[in-house]
Amino acid sequence: MNNSTIDNPQIGKDVIESLTLGMYEVCRFIYREYIQNAADAVDKAIDLSLLKKGEEAIHITIDTDHRKIIISDNATGIEQGNVMRVLRNIAHSTKKRGEDKGFRGIGRLGGLGYCSKLTFETSYYGEPSKSIMTWDSELLKYIINDRNNSEEAVQVLAQVTKLDTKKEDTKVGNKNENFDY
């Protein structure tokens, strides 16, 4: 064993399984997580005067033809410069316990156990482009089950996530959380 292994703590890839694929035994709990995230975003938009009380909206769409479930809101979105920090990192939430509905920064990943790809699409109010963070659940399962390699948790996160940007077609922030099952 080299000194860097002894001196520096390591977190193996199996912890990712506990926080994603193994978080919920019953899939319906993931919907609560995404709706709570949307509700927190709507509350923030009202607090920032981006929306007036009564203008907020959370929509749930089940698209059986394309095998997708979409949960969207008309709230603040995430600033493009913060998307990687907010949507790829785990347990780095800025939400406040007792004030926000969610606060740990892990619930959004529970959907990975029930889909092939988990997509977070967001645009911050007034920004001209939207960010699309995709988590590859199939690749995540493959990496975790591969006992011949012992990747660190952060290496796995880098491998299974992808960030794209596209021109936004509206000035109102949108946040969609999609499951391709």
Q: For the regions a protein language model found, what residue spans apply to each?
A:
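GHKL (Bergerat-fold) ATPase N-terminal catalytic module, capturing the glycine-rich phosphate-binding loop
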Residues: 1-179
